[in-house]
Regions:
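Active-site-proximal helix/loop capping residues that flank conserved catalytic or ligand/cofactor
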Residues: 35, 74, 81, 134, ...
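Aromatic- and carboxylate-lined catalytic core of secreted/periplasmic carbohydrate-active enzymes
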Residues: 119-160, 198
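Beta-strand-rich binding/interaction modules
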Residues: 187-200
């Protein structure tokens, strides 16, 4: 959240991202998550809303996407994959953040006239194939299947293979799985080389 709030895309440092998600003792079990419920409460913004902002309301219908929605969806997936693939204990999704729920949560209180209007989650959004929410939901299911279906995944170390903050790329390996991330907002790479274990 801090990186998204305080830095433009061009200033994101992959080495810092990897450090933040792996900064723990090897034997220390943790619960990893991209955002806490605090971001979903009224007065703050979720990751997806910080990335896409009001375009979530106007350009989340299939065929009507724009650059902001496509970028936000891609970054949301990458942030969640990085967080989930570096776990050492557990991964937490909650209250619709796995599919980019568009609204905040506001429980009945004096300040909102004791309204229940935003004390809900619209689970139907992820099932509507005419909207982009299902892209995030489908990705989340595939990601969880990969991590959960990989034998002894959490017993493997996160081994950094490469990072280049100038290119905004990094790679790490867990067992037989190799994860490569390009966080550059302006550059794609072909035949990008880095060292891996023999046989990878």
């Amino acid at each position: 959240i801090k990186t998204i709030k305080e830095k433009i895309d061009e200033d994101w440092k992959p080495s810092s991202m990897l450090w933040e998600t792996t900064n723990r003792r090897a034997d220390e079990k943790t619960i990893s998550y991209c955002e806490s419920h605090d971001q979903a409460l009224v007065g703050d913004k979720t990751i997806i809303f910080r990335l896409v902002d009001a375009d979530m309301y106007w350009h989340f219908k299939k065929g009507d996407e724009n650059f902001a929605t496509e970028r936000g969806i891609a970054l949301h997936k990458m942030i969640r994959l990085l967080t989930c693939s570096t776990i050492n204990g557990g991964y937490l999704n909650f209250m619709g953040n796995e599919f980019g729920h568009p609204e905040w949560i506001d429980f009945p209180r004096e300040g909102n006239g004791w309204s229940h209007k935003y004390a809900r989650r619209q689970w139907n959004l992820v099932d509507n194939k005419d909207l982009c929410y299902h892209y995030l939901g489908d990705f989340d299911q595939a990601m969880m299947s990969l991590i959960g279906g990989t034998k002894n995944f959490q017993k493997t170390k996160v081994e950094e293979r490469w990072h280049n903050d100038g290119d905004q790329v990094f790679a790490f390996q867990r067992g037989e799985l190799l994860f490569f991330f390009n966080f550059s907002p302006t550059r794609s790479y072909t035949d990008y080389g880095f060292m891996v274990k023999a046989g990878t």
